[in-house]
């Protein structure tokens, strides 16, 4: 029986894995260069490093449901009336008064809820941040207006 030549999709048995790689010999004890890591897969070879789990990707339909985070409005509220602006920043994520407040910024919490596809939480937090930020901006502008007039 005649031997068939290797097909175009199969590499030759002694061909290098890549065009730039040096040809390998059949001797598993020989190393390619001093100081280079061994990749023979033998018992003395280092274990492969496990890859980090990838974040789940979102479909275009899910990306369309992103809730706005009102980051500029929150920053504007802090600049116009810092006492309530900081309160808006701190308390806007709290669902009810029985929950303990968290120290993460509300716009960042909205972004995180958007990334985790927690739409209900993202929209509740987004609405709370927007309304409180708008309220604080109106108070700040009212105080400035009152100070300028009187």
Curated annotation (Swiss-Prot):
<keyword id="KW-0472">Membrane</keyword>
<dbReference type="GO" id="GO:0043231">
    <property type="term" value="C:intracellular membrane-bounded organelle"/>
</dbReference>
<feature type="region of interest" description="Disordered">
    <location>
        <begin position="1"/>
        <end position="61"/>
    </location>
</feature>
<feature type="compositionally biased region" description="Low complexity">
    <location>
        <begin position="1"/>
        <end position="12"/>
    </location>
</feature>
<comment type="function">
    <text>May play a role in spermatozoa mobility.</text>
</comment>
<comment type="similarity">
    <text>Belongs to the CD225/Dispanin family.</text>
</comment>
<keyword id="KW-0812">Transmembrane</keyword>
<feature type="transmembrane region" description="Helical">
    <location>
        <begin position="71"/>
        <end position="91"/>
    </location>
</feature>
<dbReference type="Pfam" id="PF04505">
    <property type="entry name" value="CD225"/>
</dbReference>
<protein>
    <recommendedName>
        <fullName>Transmembrane protein PMIS2</fullName>
    </recommendedName>
</protein>
<feature type="compositionally biased region" description="Low complexity">
    <location>
        <begin position="23"/>
        <end position="61"/>
    </location>
</feature>
<feature type="transmembrane region" description="Helical">
    <location>
        <begin position="130"/>
        <end position="150"/>
    </location>
</feature>
<dbReference type="InterPro" id="IPR007593">
    <property type="entry name" value="CD225/Dispanin_fam"/>
</dbReference>
<dbReference type="GO" id="GO:0016020">
    <property type="term" value="C:membrane"/>
</dbReference>
<keyword id="KW-1133">Transmembrane helix</keyword>
<feature type="compositionally biased region" description="Pro residues">
    <location>
        <begin position="13"/>
        <end position="22"/>
    </location>
</feature>
């Amino acid at each position: 029986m005649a031997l068939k030549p290797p097909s175009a999709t199969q590499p030759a048995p002694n061909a290098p894995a890549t065009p730039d790689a040096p040809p390998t010999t059949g001797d598993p004890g020989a190393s390619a260069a001093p100081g280079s890591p061994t990749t023979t897969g033998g018992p003395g070879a280092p274990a492969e490093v496990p890859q980090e789990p990838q974040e789940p990707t979102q479909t275009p339909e899910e990306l369309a449901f992103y809730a706005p985070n009102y980051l500029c409005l929150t920053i504007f509220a802090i600049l116009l009336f810092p006492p309530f602006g900081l309160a808006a920043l701190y308390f806007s994520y709290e669902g009810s008064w029985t929950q303990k407040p968290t120290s993460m910024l509300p716009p960042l919490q909205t972004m995180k809820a958007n990334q985790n596809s927690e739409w209900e939480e993202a929209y509740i937090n987004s609405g709370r941040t927007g309304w409180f930020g708008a309220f604080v901006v109106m108070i700040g502008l009212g105080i400035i207006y009152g100070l300028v007039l009187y």
